[in-house]
């Protein structure tokens, strides 16, 4: 009804690199649809300890968006490009393992083995710790593809940090879920 009365907008997939027609238009998938997820979530406290140890040392995060990246449409997010307002420490980036990060996170790497990660040379998997500075907002954006699911596991969740909006649905962040 909210859509009928103009209170909510219809959001459709608009991937920037590849669109596969006919896939369902779903904002969120439910956790119970993935039998491997509970095993991964159970390791959240240990993954948090690994992440906190990383955060307590020298800076190992780099800008999540950088101007040297060839991904389409990054320019519209210029307020978070080439700075650490939104940053990442990649375990895997475009299928390449970063041993300087992964050797600090053996439990995280073990937990990721429970997930059905795709291995495509030069493309996947991609797995990372993402860090957003207080007060910074990630602008609305579209993913690269509609043929994969991106899973977020909140490991450190500050009080009143908001939620994840997909289309016209928002879900609050909950540590470990």
Indicate where each model-derived feature is located.
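Fe(II)/2-oxoglutarate oxygenase catalytic core
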Residues: 1-128, 132-145, 160-161
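Generic detector of bulky aromatic hydrophobic side chains
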Residues: 86, 174-177
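Structured core elements
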Residues: 128, 152-154
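A short beta-strand-loop-beta hairpin characteristic of the jelly-roll/cupin
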Residues: 155-175
